[in-house]
Amino acid sequence: MTRVTVQTAGVHYKWQMPDQLTQQLRLAHDLREDLVTLEYEYEDAVKAVWSSYPAVAALEAQVAELDERASELASTVKEEKSRQRTKRPSHPAVAQLAETRAQLKAAKASRREAIASVRDEATERLRTISDERYAAQKQLYRDYCTDGLLYWATFNAVLDHHKTAVKRIAAHRKQGRAAQLRHHRWDGTGTISVQLQRQATDPARTPAIIADADTGKWRSSLIVPWVNPDVWDTMDRASRRKAGRVVIRMRCGSSRNPDGTKTSEWIDVPVQQHRMLPADADITAAQLTVRREGADLRATIGITAKIPDQGEVDEGPTIAVHLGWRSSDHGTVVATWRSTEPLDIPETLRGVITTQSAERTVGSIVVPHRIEQRVHHHATVASHRDLAVDSIRDTLVAWLTEHGPQPHPYDGDPITAASVQRWKAPRRFAWLALQWRDTPPPEGADIAETLEAWRRADKKLWLESEHGRGRALRHRTDLHRQVAAYFAGVAGRIVVDDSDIAQIAGTAKHSELLTDVDRQIARRRAIAAPGMLRAAIVAAATRDEVPTTTVSHTGLSRVHAACGHENPADDRYLMQPVLCDGCGRTYDTDLSATILMLQRASAATSN
Protein backbone atom coordinates (compact mmCIF):
# COMPACT_ATOMS: atom_id res chain seq x y z
CA MET A 1 0.00 0.00 0.00
CA THR A 2 1.11 3.55 -0.74
CA ARG A 3 -0.04 7.02 0.16
CA VAL A 4 0.22 10.20 -1.89
CA THR A 5 2.03 13.27 -0.58
CA VAL A 6 2.73 16.69 -2.07
CA GLN A 7 5.95 18.38 -0.98
CA THR A 8 5.93 22.14 -1.55
CA ALA A 9 8.92 24.44 -2.03
CA GLY A 10 8.87 28.22 -2.30
CA VAL A 11 10.31 29.95 -5.37
CA HIS A 12 12.70 32.85 -4.77
CA TYR A 13 10.72 36.08 -4.66
CA LYS A 14 13.15 37.87 -7.00
CA TRP A 15 12.81 35.25 -9.72
CA GLN A 16 11.76 36.82 -12.99
CA MET A 17 9.21 34.62 -14.70
CA PRO A 18 10.34 33.74 -18.24
CA ASP A 19 8.10 34.57 -21.17
CA GLN A 20 7.71 30.85 -21.88
CA LEU A 21 6.04 30.34 -18.49
CA THR A 22 3.73 33.32 -19.03
CA GLN A 23 2.74 31.86 -22.40
CA GLN A 24 1.86 28.49 -20.85
CA LEU A 25 -0.11 30.11 -18.04
CA ARG A 26 -2.09 32.16 -20.54
CA LEU A 27 -2.81 29.10 -22.67
CA ALA A 28 -3.96 27.19 -19.58
CA HIS A 29 -6.23 30.11 -18.67
CA ASP A 30 -7.71 30.27 -22.17
CA LEU A 31 -8.29 26.51 -22.07
CA ARG A 32 -10.22 26.78 -18.83
CA GLU A 33 -12.35 29.58 -20.27
CA ASP A 34 -13.15 27.42 -23.30
CA LEU A 35 -14.09 24.52 -21.03
CA VAL A 36 -16.44 26.79 -19.09
CA THR A 37 -18.03 27.91 -22.35
CA LEU A 38 -18.51 24.27 -23.39
CA GLU A 39 -20.13 23.55 -20.03
CA TYR A 40 -22.53 26.47 -20.50
CA GLU A 41 -23.48 25.14 -23.93
CA TYR A 42 -23.95 21.65 -22.49
CA GLU A 43 -26.22 22.92 -19.70
CA ASP A 44 -28.26 24.96 -22.19
CA ALA A 45 -28.68 21.89 -24.38
CA VAL A 46 -29.82 19.79 -21.42
CA LYS A 47 -32.29 22.50 -20.38
CA ALA A 48 -33.62 22.57 -23.93
CA VAL A 49 -34.27 18.82 -23.74
CA TRP A 50 -36.29 19.17 -20.53
CA SER A 51 -38.14 22.24 -21.84
CA SER A 52 -39.28 20.26 -24.87
CA TYR A 53 -41.68 18.36 -22.59
CA PRO A 54 -44.85 20.45 -21.98
CA ALA A 55 -45.24 19.44 -18.32
CA VAL A 56 -41.69 20.49 -17.51
CA ALA A 57 -41.99 23.70 -19.55
CA ALA A 58 -45.12 24.74 -17.64
CA LEU A 59 -43.38 24.24 -14.30
CA GLU A 60 -40.32 26.15 -15.53
CA ALA A 61 -42.53 29.12 -16.36
CA GLN A 62 -44.02 28.92 -12.87
CA VAL A 63 -40.54 28.77 -11.31
CA ALA A 64 -39.40 31.81 -13.32
CA GLU A 65 -42.47 33.81 -12.25
CA LEU A 66 -42.05 32.91 -8.57
CA ASP A 67 -38.32 33.60 -8.71
CA GLU A 68 -38.92 37.08 -10.09
CA ARG A 69 -41.57 37.72 -7.43
CA ALA A 70 -39.19 36.54 -4.68
CA SER A 71 -36.45 38.87 -5.94
CA GLU A 72 -38.81 41.85 -5.83
CA LEU A 73 -39.95 41.01 -2.30
CA ALA A 74 -36.36 40.44 -1.17
CA SER A 75 -35.45 43.93 -2.39
CA THR A 76 -38.39 45.38 -0.46
CA VAL A 77 -37.39 43.54 2.72
CA LYS A 78 -33.81 44.73 2.32
CA GLU A 79 -34.97 48.33 2.05
CA GLU A 80 -37.15 47.92 5.15
CA LYS A 81 -34.24 46.47 7.11
CA SER A 82 -32.20 49.53 6.25
CA ARG A 83 -35.05 51.95 6.96
CA GLN A 84 -36.07 50.36 10.27
CA ARG A 85 -32.44 49.59 11.23
CA THR A 86 -33.22 46.02 12.27
CA LYS A 87 -32.63 42.52 10.93
CA ARG A 88 -36.30 41.59 11.46
CA PRO A 89 -38.40 44.44 10.07
CA SER A 90 -42.13 44.73 10.58
CA HIS A 91 -43.61 44.74 7.08
CA PRO A 92 -46.11 42.58 5.10
CA ALA A 93 -43.37 41.82 2.55
CA VAL A 94 -41.58 39.64 5.12
CA ALA A 95 -44.44 37.12 5.32
CA GLN A 96 -45.05 37.38 1.58
CA LEU A 97 -41.39 36.62 0.89
CA ALA A 98 -41.46 33.55 3.12
CA GLU A 99 -44.63 32.31 1.42
CA THR A 100 -43.25 32.97 -2.07
CA ARG A 101 -40.01 31.17 -1.30
CA ALA A 102 -41.98 28.18 0.00
CA GLN A 103 -43.99 28.14 -3.23
CA LEU A 104 -40.79 28.46 -5.24
CA LYS A 105 -39.24 25.53 -3.38
CA ALA A 106 -42.34 23.42 -4.03
CA ALA A 107 -42.37 24.39 -7.72
CA LYS A 108 -38.72 23.40 -8.11
CA ALA A 109 -39.45 20.07 -6.44
CA SER A 110 -42.36 19.52 -8.83
CA ARG A 111 -40.08 20.32 -11.77
CA ARG A 112 -37.57 17.73 -10.56
CA GLU A 113 -40.35 15.16 -10.30
CA ALA A 114 -41.55 16.00 -13.81
CA ILE A 115 -38.00 15.61 -15.13
CA ALA A 116 -37.64 12.26 -13.36
CA SER A 117 -40.83 11.02 -15.02
CA VAL A 118 -39.45 11.65 -18.53
CA ARG A 119 -35.79 10.86 -17.87
CA ASP A 120 -35.94 7.39 -19.44
CA GLU A 121 -37.52 8.82 -22.55
CA ALA A 122 -34.81 11.49 -22.83
CA THR A 123 -31.87 9.16 -22.15
CA GLU A 124 -30.78 8.85 -25.77
CA ARG A 125 -30.94 12.60 -26.38
CA LEU A 126 -28.93 13.27 -23.22
CA ARG A 127 -26.33 10.70 -24.24
CA THR A 128 -25.94 12.44 -27.60
CA ILE A 129 -25.40 15.79 -25.89
CA SER A 130 -22.82 14.25 -23.54
CA ASP A 131 -20.98 12.67 -26.47
CA GLU A 132 -20.89 16.03 -28.24
CA ARG A 133 -19.35 17.65 -25.16
CA TYR A 134 -16.71 14.90 -24.96
CA ALA A 135 -15.90 15.35 -28.66
CA ALA A 136 -15.57 19.11 -28.17
CA GLN A 137 -13.14 18.56 -25.29
CA LYS A 138 -11.04 16.24 -27.46
CA GLN A 139 -11.02 18.91 -30.16
CA LEU A 140 -9.64 21.35 -27.60
CA TYR A 141 -6.69 18.98 -27.06
CA ARG A 142 -5.94 19.07 -30.77
CA ASP A 143 -6.25 22.86 -30.84
CA TYR A 144 -4.12 23.55 -27.76
CA CYS A 145 -1.60 20.69 -27.75
CA THR A 146 -1.38 18.88 -31.09
CA ASP A 147 -1.58 22.04 -33.19
CA GLY A 148 -0.83 24.53 -30.40
CA LEU A 149 1.97 25.02 -27.89
CA LEU A 150 0.37 23.99 -24.58
CA TYR A 151 2.10 21.12 -22.78
CA TRP A 152 -0.07 17.99 -22.63
CA ALA A 153 0.37 17.51 -18.87
CA THR A 154 -0.95 21.01 -18.19
CA PHE A 155 -3.93 20.28 -20.44
CA ASN A 156 -4.71 17.14 -18.43
CA ALA A 157 -4.39 19.02 -15.14
CA VAL A 158 -6.71 21.82 -16.27
CA LEU A 159 -9.27 19.31 -17.57
CA ASP A 160 -9.16 17.28 -14.35
CA HIS A 161 -9.61 20.44 -12.29
CA HIS A 162 -12.55 21.44 -14.49
CA LYS A 163 -14.23 18.05 -14.10
CA THR A 164 -13.78 18.23 -10.33
CA ALA A 165 -15.39 21.68 -10.29
CA VAL A 166 -18.33 20.39 -12.35
CA LYS A 167 -18.88 17.52 -9.91
CA ARG A 168 -18.70 19.88 -6.93
CA ILE A 169 -21.25 22.20 -8.51
CA ALA A 170 -23.56 19.26 -9.22
CA ALA A 171 -23.29 18.18 -5.58
CA HIS A 172 -24.10 21.70 -4.36
CA ARG A 173 -27.12 21.93 -6.65
CA LYS A 174 -28.33 18.56 -5.42
CA GLN A 175 -28.28 20.02 -1.90
CA GLY A 176 -30.33 22.99 -3.08
CA ARG A 177 -27.41 25.43 -3.02
CA ALA A 178 -26.77 27.90 -5.84
CA ALA A 179 -23.59 27.09 -7.76
CA GLN A 180 -22.28 28.04 -11.18
CA LEU A 181 -19.04 27.99 -13.16
CA ARG A 182 -17.79 31.47 -13.95
CA HIS A 183 -15.45 33.08 -16.42
CA HIS A 184 -12.37 34.81 -15.00
CA ARG A 185 -10.20 37.53 -16.46
CA TRP A 186 -6.52 36.84 -17.07
CA ASP A 187 -4.37 38.19 -14.22
CA GLY A 188 -1.08 36.40 -14.81
CA THR A 189 -1.71 33.56 -12.35
CA GLY A 190 -2.27 29.85 -12.83
CA THR A 191 -0.61 26.44 -12.70
CA ILE A 192 1.46 24.39 -15.12
CA SER A 193 2.11 20.69 -14.64
CA VAL A 194 4.58 17.95 -15.50
CA GLN A 195 3.59 14.28 -15.37
CA LEU A 196 6.14 11.46 -15.27
CA GLN A 197 4.74 8.48 -17.17
CA ARG A 198 6.19 5.09 -16.35
CA GLN A 199 5.95 1.79 -18.20
CA ALA A 200 6.16 -1.56 -16.43
CA THR A 201 9.72 -2.07 -17.68
CA ASP A 202 10.93 1.38 -16.60
CA PRO A 203 12.90 1.93 -13.38
CA ALA A 204 11.19 3.36 -10.33
CA ARG A 205 10.80 7.15 -10.31
CA THR A 206 12.88 7.56 -7.16
CA PRO A 207 14.25 10.95 -6.03
CA ALA A 208 17.77 9.80 -6.92
CA ILE A 209 16.81 9.07 -10.53
CA ILE A 210 14.77 12.28 -10.89
CA ALA A 211 17.80 14.22 -9.57
CA ASP A 212 20.14 12.64 -12.15
CA ALA A 213 20.58 15.32 -14.82
CA ASP A 214 22.91 13.18 -16.97
CA THR A 215 21.38 9.71 -17.27
CA GLY A 216 18.02 9.97 -15.48
CA LYS A 217 15.10 8.39 -17.34
CA TRP A 218 12.91 11.49 -16.91
CA ARG A 219 15.57 14.21 -17.20
CA SER A 220 13.78 15.62 -20.25
CA SER A 221 10.69 16.35 -18.13
CA LEU A 222 11.82 17.09 -14.57
CA ILE A 223 15.06 17.41 -12.60
CA VAL A 224 14.75 17.92 -8.83
CA PRO A 225 18.01 18.00 -6.80
CA TRP A 226 17.88 15.67 -3.81
CA VAL A 227 19.83 14.87 -0.66
CA ASN A 228 19.46 11.50 1.03
CA PRO A 229 17.31 11.95 4.17
CA ASP A 230 19.90 10.04 6.22
CA VAL A 231 22.44 12.75 5.36
CA TRP A 232 19.88 15.56 5.58
CA ASP A 233 18.93 14.63 9.16
CA THR A 234 22.55 15.01 10.29
CA MET A 235 22.84 18.60 9.00
CA ASP A 236 22.34 21.66 11.16
CA ARG A 237 19.80 24.32 10.19
CA ALA A 238 22.28 26.53 8.33
CA SER A 239 23.63 23.60 6.31
CA ARG A 240 20.10 22.51 5.40
CA ARG A 241 19.20 25.97 4.16
CA LYS A 242 22.35 26.08 2.04
CA ALA A 243 21.85 22.58 0.65
CA GLY A 244 18.16 23.33 0.03
CA ARG A 245 18.87 26.31 -2.25
CA VAL A 246 18.62 24.49 -5.56
CA VAL A 247 17.33 24.98 -9.09
CA ILE A 248 14.54 22.73 -10.36
CA ARG A 249 14.41 22.20 -14.10
CA MET A 250 11.03 21.33 -15.60
CA ARG A 251 9.42 21.04 -19.00
CA CYS A 252 7.38 24.09 -20.01
CA GLY A 253 5.58 23.48 -23.30
CA SER A 254 6.97 24.30 -26.72
CA SER A 255 7.88 27.25 -28.91
CA ARG A 256 7.19 27.72 -32.62
CA ASN A 257 10.07 27.82 -35.09
CA PRO A 258 10.00 30.05 -38.18
CA ASP A 259 9.38 26.99 -40.37
CA GLY A 260 6.30 26.03 -38.32
CA THR A 261 7.85 23.17 -36.36
CA LYS A 262 7.86 23.06 -32.56
CA THR A 263 10.78 22.98 -30.13
CA SER A 264 10.53 21.73 -26.56
CA GLU A 265 11.19 24.34 -23.86
CA TRP A 266 12.35 24.10 -20.23
CA ILE A 267 12.53 26.56 -17.37
CA ASP A 268 14.93 26.73 -14.42
CA VAL A 269 13.21 27.58 -11.13
CA PRO A 270 15.25 28.59 -8.01
CA VAL A 271 13.62 27.17 -4.88
CA GLN A 272 14.27 26.67 -1.18
CA GLN A 273 13.74 23.07 -0.06
CA HIS A 274 12.98 22.44 3.62
CA ARG A 275 12.77 18.64 3.64
CA MET A 276 13.60 15.67 1.43
CA LEU A 277 11.47 12.85 0.09
CA PRO A 278 12.29 9.31 1.27
CA ALA A 279 14.69 7.34 -0.91
CA ASP A 280 11.93 4.89 -1.91
CA ALA A 281 9.40 7.58 -2.90
CA ASP A 282 7.79 7.33 -6.35
CA ILE A 283 7.60 10.83 -7.91
CA THR A 284 4.65 11.09 -10.29
CA ALA A 285 4.21 14.80 -11.09
CA ALA A 286 5.19 18.40 -10.40
CA GLN A 287 3.13 21.58 -10.42
CA LEU A 288 4.32 25.18 -10.61
CA THR A 289 1.67 27.55 -9.24
CA VAL A 290 1.81 31.32 -9.69
CA ARG A 291 -0.42 33.48 -7.48
CA ARG A 292 -0.80 37.22 -7.12
CA GLU A 293 0.03 39.08 -3.93
CA GLY A 294 -0.67 42.75 -4.39
CA ALA A 295 1.11 43.95 -7.52
CA ASP A 296 3.63 41.09 -7.36
CA LEU A 297 3.55 37.49 -8.51
CA ARG A 298 4.70 34.69 -6.21
CA ALA A 299 5.33 31.07 -7.19
CA THR A 300 5.55 27.69 -5.47
CA ILE A 301 6.43 24.22 -6.73
CA GLY A 302 4.70 21.09 -5.53
CA ILE A 303 6.24 17.64 -6.05
CA THR A 304 3.68 14.81 -5.97
CA ALA A 305 4.97 11.40 -4.87
CA LYS A 306 3.75 8.02 -3.68
CA ILE A 307 5.30 6.83 -0.43
CA PRO A 308 5.08 3.24 0.87
CA ASP A 309 2.93 2.82 3.97
CA GLN A 310 4.80 2.08 7.17
CA GLY A 311 1.73 0.77 8.99
CA GLU A 312 -0.75 2.62 11.18
CA VAL A 313 0.37 3.99 14.52
CA ASP A 314 -0.97 1.81 17.34
CA GLU A 315 0.62 3.50 20.36
CA GLY A 316 -0.16 6.77 22.07
CA PRO A 317 -3.17 8.55 23.56
CA THR A 318 -6.44 9.30 21.82
CA ILE A 319 -6.85 13.05 21.30
CA ALA A 320 -10.23 14.65 20.58
CA VAL A 321 -10.32 18.10 18.95
CA HIS A 322 -13.62 20.00 19.06
CA LEU A 323 -13.88 23.10 16.87
CA GLY A 324 -15.30 26.41 18.03
CA TRP A 325 -14.37 30.06 18.26
CA ARG A 326 -14.49 32.20 21.37
CA SER A 327 -12.60 35.27 22.50
CA SER A 328 -10.10 34.91 25.32
CA ASP A 329 -7.46 37.02 27.05
CA HIS A 330 -4.70 35.56 24.88
CA GLY A 331 -6.46 35.38 21.51
CA THR A 332 -9.24 33.57 19.70
CA VAL A 333 -9.89 30.01 20.88
CA VAL A 334 -10.42 27.90 17.75
CA ALA A 335 -10.67 24.45 19.32
CA THR A 336 -10.77 22.53 22.59
CA TRP A 337 -8.74 19.32 22.95
CA ARG A 338 -8.83 16.40 25.34
CA SER A 339 -6.34 13.53 25.64
CA THR A 340 -6.66 10.17 27.34
CA GLU A 341 -3.10 10.63 28.65
CA PRO A 342 -1.13 13.68 29.86
CA LEU A 343 0.61 15.65 27.13
CA ASP A 344 3.96 17.39 27.43
CA ILE A 345 3.39 20.52 25.33
CA PRO A 346 6.61 21.85 23.72
CA GLU A 347 7.70 25.21 25.06
CA THR A 348 7.50 26.75 21.57
CA LEU A 349 3.77 25.88 21.36
CA ARG A 350 2.64 26.69 24.90
CA GLY A 351 1.24 30.02 23.78
CA VAL A 352 -0.90 28.24 21.18
CA ILE A 353 -1.74 24.90 22.85
CA THR A 354 -2.86 25.77 26.37
CA THR A 355 -3.76 23.40 29.21
CA GLN A 356 -6.69 23.85 31.58
CA SER A 357 -5.85 21.20 34.17
CA ALA A 358 -2.86 20.13 36.23
CA GLU A 359 -3.13 16.67 34.64
CA ARG A 360 -2.41 18.23 31.19
CA THR A 361 -5.19 16.20 29.60
CA VAL A 362 -7.46 19.03 28.43
CA GLY A 363 -6.89 22.46 26.97
CA SER A 364 -7.48 24.89 24.11
CA ILE A 365 -5.89 25.86 20.83
CA VAL A 366 -5.54 29.63 20.55
CA VAL A 367 -4.72 31.96 17.67
CA PRO A 368 -2.76 34.79 19.35
CA HIS A 369 -4.13 38.34 19.36
CA ARG A 370 -1.04 39.61 17.54
CA ILE A 371 -2.15 37.92 14.30
CA GLU A 372 -5.56 39.59 14.39
CA GLN A 373 -3.92 42.91 15.26
CA ARG A 374 -1.59 42.63 12.26
CA VAL A 375 -4.48 41.84 9.93
CA HIS A 376 -6.51 44.72 11.38
CA HIS A 377 -3.59 47.12 10.88
CA HIS A 378 -3.27 46.21 7.22
CA ALA A 379 -7.06 46.45 6.81
CA THR A 380 -6.75 50.01 8.11
CA VAL A 381 -4.06 50.69 5.50
CA ALA A 382 -6.41 49.32 2.83
CA SER A 383 -9.18 51.65 4.04
CA HIS A 384 -6.83 54.63 3.68
CA ARG A 385 -6.22 53.46 0.14
CA ASP A 386 -9.97 53.41 -0.54
CA LEU A 387 -10.29 56.99 0.72
CA ALA A 388 -7.48 58.03 -1.63
CA VAL A 389 -9.36 56.41 -4.53
CA ASP A 390 -12.45 58.48 -3.70
CA SER A 391 -10.33 61.63 -3.72
CA ILE A 392 -8.64 60.93 -7.07
CA ARG A 393 -12.01 60.02 -8.59
CA ASP A 394 -13.47 63.38 -7.57
CA THR A 395 -10.40 65.17 -8.92
CA LEU A 396 -10.57 63.38 -12.28
CA VAL A 397 -14.33 63.90 -12.59
CA ALA A 398 -13.91 67.62 -11.93
CA TRP A 399 -11.17 67.86 -14.58
CA LEU A 400 -13.24 65.98 -17.17
CA THR A 401 -16.25 68.14 -16.39
CA GLU A 402 -14.18 71.24 -17.11
CA HIS A 403 -12.25 69.97 -20.16
CA GLY A 404 -14.80 67.60 -21.62
CA PRO A 405 -14.55 63.92 -22.68
CA GLN A 406 -11.15 62.55 -23.67
CA PRO A 407 -10.43 59.90 -26.32
CA HIS A 408 -9.83 56.39 -25.04
CA PRO A 409 -6.27 55.14 -25.77
CA TYR A 410 -7.48 52.14 -27.77
CA ASP A 411 -11.25 51.85 -27.32
CA GLY A 412 -13.85 53.70 -29.32
CA ASP A 413 -15.78 54.99 -26.31
CA PRO A 414 -14.52 58.30 -24.87
CA ILE A 415 -13.58 58.75 -21.22
CA THR A 416 -16.29 60.95 -19.72
CA ALA A 417 -16.96 62.36 -16.27
CA ALA A 418 -20.08 60.18 -15.99
CA SER A 419 -18.19 56.97 -16.80
CA VAL A 420 -15.33 57.79 -14.40
CA GLN A 421 -17.87 58.50 -11.66
CA ARG A 422 -18.82 54.81 -11.86
CA TRP A 423 -15.23 53.55 -11.57
CA LYS A 424 -14.68 51.69 -8.32
CA ALA A 425 -11.53 49.60 -8.81
CA PRO A 426 -8.17 51.36 -8.23
CA ARG A 427 -6.67 49.47 -11.18
CA ARG A 428 -8.74 51.54 -13.64
CA PHE A 429 -7.25 54.79 -12.35
CA ALA A 430 -3.78 53.21 -12.27
CA TRP A 431 -4.22 52.11 -15.88
CA LEU A 432 -5.22 55.62 -16.92
CA ALA A 433 -2.28 57.09 -15.01
CA LEU A 434 0.12 54.86 -16.97
CA GLN A 435 -1.57 55.75 -20.28
CA TRP A 436 -1.39 59.50 -19.64
CA ARG A 437 2.05 59.46 -18.03
CA ASP A 438 3.88 59.52 -21.37
CA THR A 439 1.12 60.93 -23.59
CA PRO A 440 -1.06 63.28 -21.51
CA PRO A 441 -4.27 64.66 -23.04
CA PRO A 442 -4.38 68.22 -24.39
CA GLU A 443 -3.99 70.70 -21.52
CA GLY A 444 -3.80 67.68 -19.22
CA ALA A 445 -0.20 67.69 -17.99
CA ASP A 446 -1.31 68.65 -14.48
CA ILE A 447 -3.96 65.93 -14.18
CA ALA A 448 -1.50 63.38 -15.60
CA GLU A 449 1.03 64.31 -12.92
CA THR A 450 -1.66 64.12 -10.24
CA LEU A 451 -2.73 60.67 -11.42
CA GLU A 452 0.86 59.43 -11.53
CA ALA A 453 1.57 60.73 -8.02
CA TRP A 454 -1.55 58.99 -6.76
CA ARG A 455 -0.59 55.76 -8.58
CA ARG A 456 2.83 55.64 -6.95
CA ALA A 457 1.40 56.23 -3.48
CA ASP A 458 -1.43 53.76 -4.08
CA LYS A 459 0.96 51.04 -5.20
CA LYS A 460 3.01 51.48 -2.03
CA LEU A 461 -0.12 51.17 0.15
CA TRP A 462 -1.33 48.21 -1.91
CA LEU A 463 1.91 46.30 -1.50
CA GLU A 464 2.11 47.11 2.20
CA SER A 465 -1.43 45.93 2.94
CA GLU A 466 -1.41 42.81 0.76
CA HIS A 467 2.05 41.58 1.73
CA GLY A 468 1.49 42.38 5.40
CA ARG A 469 -1.87 40.66 5.50
CA GLY A 470 -0.44 37.68 3.65
CA ARG A 471 2.43 37.33 6.11
CA ALA A 472 0.04 37.47 9.07
CA LEU A 473 -2.25 34.81 7.62
CA ARG A 474 0.68 32.60 6.69
CA HIS A 475 1.86 32.91 10.31
CA ARG A 476 -1.56 31.66 11.39
CA THR A 477 -1.44 28.78 8.91
CA ASP A 478 2.04 27.85 10.10
CA LEU A 479 0.81 27.73 13.72
CA HIS A 480 -2.06 25.46 12.66
CA ARG A 481 0.40 23.14 10.94
CA GLN A 482 2.72 23.09 13.95
CA VAL A 483 -0.20 22.14 16.20
CA ALA A 484 -1.26 19.46 13.72
CA ALA A 485 2.27 18.06 13.48
CA TYR A 486 2.57 17.89 17.27
CA PHE A 487 -0.76 16.09 17.74
CA ALA A 488 0.04 13.66 14.90
CA GLY A 489 3.44 13.00 16.44
CA VAL A 490 2.17 12.03 19.91
CA ALA A 491 -1.32 10.61 19.28
CA GLY A 492 -2.28 7.01 18.73
CA ARG A 493 -5.66 8.15 17.37
CA ILE A 494 -7.18 11.56 16.60
CA VAL A 495 -10.90 12.26 16.89
CA VAL A 496 -12.57 15.20 15.11
CA ASP A 497 -16.21 16.13 14.59
CA ASP A 498 -18.01 16.77 11.31
CA SER A 499 -19.21 20.30 12.11
CA ASP A 500 -19.96 22.38 9.00
CA ILE A 501 -18.22 25.68 9.75
CA ALA A 502 -19.83 27.44 6.77
CA GLN A 503 -23.30 26.38 7.87
CA ILE A 504 -22.71 27.53 11.45
CA ALA A 505 -21.36 30.84 10.19
CA GLY A 506 -24.41 31.24 7.94
CA THR A 507 -26.74 30.63 10.88
CA ALA A 508 -24.94 33.32 12.86
CA LYS A 509 -25.94 35.89 10.23
CA HIS A 510 -29.54 35.76 11.51
CA SER A 511 -28.64 36.65 15.10
CA GLU A 512 -30.03 39.70 16.88
CA LEU A 513 -26.57 41.22 17.30
CA LEU A 514 -25.79 44.54 15.69
CA THR A 515 -24.48 44.32 12.14
CA ASP A 516 -21.10 45.81 13.09
CA VAL A 517 -20.73 43.26 15.89
CA ASP A 518 -21.66 40.44 13.53
CA ARG A 519 -19.06 41.63 11.05
CA GLN A 520 -16.38 41.79 13.71
CA ILE A 521 -17.20 38.25 14.85
CA ALA A 522 -17.15 37.00 11.25
CA ARG A 523 -13.83 38.74 10.62
CA ARG A 524 -12.21 37.21 13.69
CA ARG A 525 -13.60 33.79 12.78
CA ALA A 526 -12.17 34.07 9.27
CA ILE A 527 -8.77 35.05 10.65
CA ALA A 528 -8.75 32.21 13.21
CA ALA A 529 -9.87 29.69 10.53
CA PRO A 530 -10.99 26.71 12.68
CA GLY A 531 -11.85 24.72 9.56
CA MET A 532 -8.28 25.06 8.30
CA LEU A 533 -7.02 23.80 11.66
CA ARG A 534 -9.13 20.66 11.37
CA ALA A 535 -7.97 20.10 7.79
CA ALA A 536 -4.34 20.50 8.88
CA ILE A 537 -4.78 18.01 11.74
CA VAL A 538 -6.41 15.42 9.49
CA ALA A 539 -3.73 15.92 6.81
CA ALA A 540 -0.90 15.55 9.34
CA ALA A 541 -2.51 12.43 10.80
CA THR A 542 -2.89 10.93 7.33
CA ARG A 543 0.73 11.76 6.50
CA ASP A 544 2.02 10.14 9.70
CA GLU A 545 -0.44 7.23 9.40
CA VAL A 546 -2.25 8.06 12.64
CA PRO A 547 -5.81 6.64 12.64
CA THR A 548 -8.48 9.34 12.45
CA THR A 549 -12.09 8.98 13.59
CA THR A 550 -14.77 11.48 12.60
CA VAL A 551 -17.82 11.57 14.88
CA SER A 552 -21.16 13.28 14.40
CA HIS A 553 -21.48 16.80 15.79
CA THR A 554 -25.15 16.23 16.63
CA GLY A 555 -25.84 16.96 20.28
CA LEU A 556 -22.25 17.69 21.25
CA SER A 557 -23.20 21.04 22.79
CA ARG A 558 -26.67 20.09 24.03
CA VAL A 559 -25.79 16.85 25.81
CA HIS A 560 -24.25 17.23 29.27
CA ALA A 561 -21.58 14.53 29.41
CA ALA A 562 -21.70 14.29 33.22
CA CYS A 563 -25.39 13.34 33.47
CA GLY A 564 -26.27 12.43 29.87
CA HIS A 565 -29.23 14.81 29.67
CA GLU A 566 -29.91 16.38 26.25
CA ASN A 567 -30.91 19.99 26.66
CA PRO A 568 -33.22 21.78 24.20
CA ALA A 569 -31.89 23.57 21.13
CA ASP A 570 -32.09 27.23 22.13
CA ASP A 571 -29.78 30.24 22.43
CA ARG A 572 -28.20 29.26 25.75
CA TYR A 573 -25.12 27.81 24.01
CA LEU A 574 -23.91 31.20 22.81
CA MET A 575 -22.44 31.88 26.25
CA GLN A 576 -20.37 29.83 28.70
CA PRO A 577 -21.15 28.09 31.01
CA VAL A 578 -24.54 26.48 30.25
CA LEU A 579 -27.15 25.43 32.81
CA CYS A 580 -28.20 21.78 32.41
CA ASP A 581 -31.96 21.21 32.78
CA GLY A 582 -31.33 17.60 33.79
CA CYS A 583 -29.04 17.89 36.80
CA GLY A 584 -29.26 21.61 37.49
CA ARG A 585 -25.49 22.11 37.24
CA THR A 586 -23.58 24.32 34.86
CA TYR A 587 -21.13 22.90 32.36
CA ASP A 588 -18.67 24.03 29.69
CA THR A 589 -20.11 22.88 26.36
CA ASP A 590 -16.68 22.59 24.70
CA LEU A 591 -15.17 20.46 27.47
CA SER A 592 -18.30 18.33 27.61
CA ALA A 593 -18.17 17.89 23.83
CA THR A 594 -14.64 16.47 23.93
CA ILE A 595 -15.77 13.83 26.48
CA LEU A 596 -18.67 12.86 24.22
CA MET A 597 -16.35 12.70 21.21
CA LEU A 598 -14.02 10.27 22.98
CA GLN A 599 -17.01 8.14 24.01
CA ARG A 600 -18.43 8.07 20.48
CA ALA A 601 -15.03 7.29 18.96
CA SER A 602 -14.52 4.44 21.44
CA ALA A 603 -17.92 3.01 20.56
CA ALA A 604 -17.23 3.32 16.82
CA THR A 605 -13.82 1.61 16.96
CA SER A 606 -15.01 -1.21 19.22
CA ASN A 607 -17.77 -2.25 16.81
Curated annotation (Swiss-Prot):
Single GO BP term: defense response to virus
Subunit and interaction comment: Binds crRNA and target dsDNA as a monomer.
Family named by the database record: Belongs to the CRISPR-associated DNA-binding protein Cas12m family.
Residue span of region RuvC-II: 589-607
Wedge domain (WED-N), as annotated region: 1-16
Region ranges (RuvC-I): 316-559
Protein name according to UniProt: CRISPR-associated DNA-binding protein Cas12m
Region of interest (Wedge domain (WED-C)), residue spans: 190-315
Source taxonomy: Bacteria, Bacillati, Actinomycetota, Actinomycetes, Mycobacteriales
UniProt note: domains: Has a bilobed structure, with a recognition (REC) lobe and nuclease (NUC) lobe. The REC lobe (residues 1-315) is formed by the discontinuous wedge (WED) and recognition (REC) domains, while the NUC lobe (residues 316-607) is formed by the discontinuous RuvC and target nucleic-acid binding (TNB) domains with a zinc finger domain. The crRNA-single-strand target DNA duplex is bound in the central channel between the 2 lobes.
Keyword Metal-binding: yes
Gene: cas12m
Cofactor: Mg(2+); Zn(2+)
